[in-house]
Amino acid sequence: MKNYLIIGIILLFPFRLFADEPVKAIYAKITNPDNKEVTVVAHRADWRFAPENSLAAIESSIRLGADVVELDVQKTKDGQLILMHDKTLDRTTTGKGKVAEWTLDSIRTLRLKNGAALRTKHRVPTLEEALLTTKGR
C-alpha cells in the first residue's frame, strides 16, 4: 500500500504544473468534508466508448461531464510515462510482453484494443499527451 501512495503522490506532482481554476475547484470540492455534491470520476476514462486510458476515452469523459478522469501510468524501457493500467501490453494492445521491456517508439507502433479485445485505430498515449488534452477542462 505504501508503494501505491508514493506513486500516487509522485504522479500528482505534474498536475500542479497544469493546475488552474477547474482543478482547484474540484480539489476544493473533494477535500471539503461538508460537501454534499457527488463527484463523478471516470475510471480509466470512458472505456465503454473508446479503449481505456486512450485520448478518445478522455475526450468522451470530458464531454459527458466527468469531474475527474482517473488514469493509469506505466514507465517504458526508455523511461517514458504512458497511459496503461497493466504492467503488460497483452490485454489492452496488439503487443505482447512487459511495458518496461518496450521503448516508447516501439509502443507507438501498436494499437489499443477495446473492451471486447478488438483492435482499434487508437494508439497508446503518453502522460504528457493526456495532461495537454485535459489542461483547463
Question: What residue ranges belong to the model's regions?
Answer:
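Phosphate-group recognition and catalysis centered on beta-loop-alpha active-site segments
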Residues: 18-137
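Bacterial Sec-dependent N-terminal signal peptides
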Residues: 1-23
